[in-house]
Structure formats: C-alpha cells, structure tokens
A protein has these predicted regions:
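Generic structural signal for hydrophobic core residues of well-folded globular domains
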Residues: 28, 128-130, 172
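Short, functionally important structural connectors and interaction interfaces within domains
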Residues: 36, 40, 132, 186-188, ...
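Glycine-/small-residue-rich beta-strand-loop submotif within the FAD-binding core of flavoenzymes
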Residues: 1-2, 196
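Short low-complexity stretches enriched in small and charged residues
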Residues: 12-15, 104-108, 170-178
Length: 211
C-alpha cells in the first residue's frame, strides 16, 4: 500500500519456503546490505533443489483396483542397487489416481478411457535426489518477478530406478506400464536456497539456521 512500517524485535523468523524466503532476502537490498540481508556470501537463492520425480502407472484391464488405503506402501529396496554405489532413490504409492487427475496430463483422452484406466491401475511415485548447483537458483527481476532457473541433474541414477520399477510392475502382473517424468512444475519438495554451514563465505545460515 506504499506505507512503511517498522517492527522491532529480538528475533525474526523467515519461513516462507525455498523460493519466497530467498526472494524476500534478495528484495531487501539497501545501502547497508547492497546484495540483500544475509547475502554476504552471494549464495541466497542458489542451490535450489526439488527432487527428481516420476509418476508411474501399472495398468491391467482385467484387474480392478478397489483400494481404500491409498498411501500405505513405500520401498527402499533399490536405494543402494547402483553398481556405482550411487543412491537411486525411493518408491512409494502415489495415492489412487482418479480420472480427473489423468485428464490434467492427457486432456485429449476421452473421459471413459481415463475412468477405466484409473479403476484398473496401480500408481507409484519414484523419487531421487537432485544435487545442489549454483546454476539452479531463485532470482528476482527488477520489476519484482520471481524466476526459477533449473536444469535437472543426477538423472542417471533416477533413470536406473525407473527401469527397476518398470520391471517390478511387469513381473507382478501389469502388462502395460505408463510413466511421466516430472519437471519444474512438480516443485512441492523445493529446498536448498538458504544453505547452512559453518563457513560464512560458503553459507547463508549457521548450523542453527540463523543468519
């Protein structure tokens, strides 16, 4: 509204998520803090991570899925299954997908087909770690618009997990396996933009998450 307010306190807690917390600090530039509060390292907004994620659906037209407990299974069986010793990630139930959810991903598909698919599918979520990179970051334009700059990394291990999960679904009786590897739009797990550490030259926060 254009008015300035002054709030005095011993402590302030900034807890606005990985994107907005970084954006608030980047917007706080002043003569005293030319790069924004807590940004003497220049790392505010950098090292944005979000997880590598794939939605996978096993489909069998002759087996109806009547589950009532939609989020009861999680597997780490392939976590250390890489010959290179690289963590592959985690598999968990996605929850029971419904026709309207499939419609969002495949708007051209007829509703009756999506309903049949939803009633005869087993749905899992594959999650692997992405790695911190200063090229993956949150920035704020001069006009105040928040931008996310992101390029997927560590996909080799994630793709190995996808192959293992696909084989598993085939073995347990799903002749058709569909998958969708998610991109930046699946960002509910974002983190990393205010990195903590013991060296203020290489971190934004200390080991107690204080700036």
């Amino acid at each position: 509204d254009g008015e300035k307010y002054e709030i005095i306190a011993n402590y302030f807690i900034l807890s606005a998520g990985a994107a907005n917390s970084a954006a608030l600090l980047l917007k706080s530039k002043s003569e005293k803090f030319p790069h924004g509060l807590a940004n003497s390292s220049g790392l505010v907004g950098k090292n944005w991570m979000v997880h590598n994620a794939t939605f996978m659906v096993g489909f069998n037209p002759f087996r109806r899925n009547k589950t009532k407990f939609q989020k009861t299974l999680m597997l780490n069986d392939w976590y250390w299954d890489s010959p290179q010793g690289i963590p592959l990630g985690n598999i968990q139930m996605l929850g029971k997908l419904q026709a309207a959810m499939f419609k969002g991903a495949r708007p051209w598909a007829p509703n009756w087909a999506l309903k049949f698919l939803a009633e005869h599918s087993f749905d899992i979520y594959l999650e692997s770690e992405d790695l911190p990179s200063q090229e993956n970051k949150v920035t704020v334009d001069e006009d105040g618009v928040i931008r996310i700059h992101w390029k997927a990394n560590n996909m080799k291990s994630h793709n190995q997990l996808v192959k293992s999960a696909r084989r598993m679904l085939h073995r347990v009786g799903f002749p058709i396996v569909l998958k969708e590897t998610m991109g930046i739009e699946t960002n509910s797990h974002m983190c990393g933009t205010l990195v903590a550490g013991n060296d203020p030259r290489k971190s934004v926060l200390d080991s107690y998450c204080k700036a």
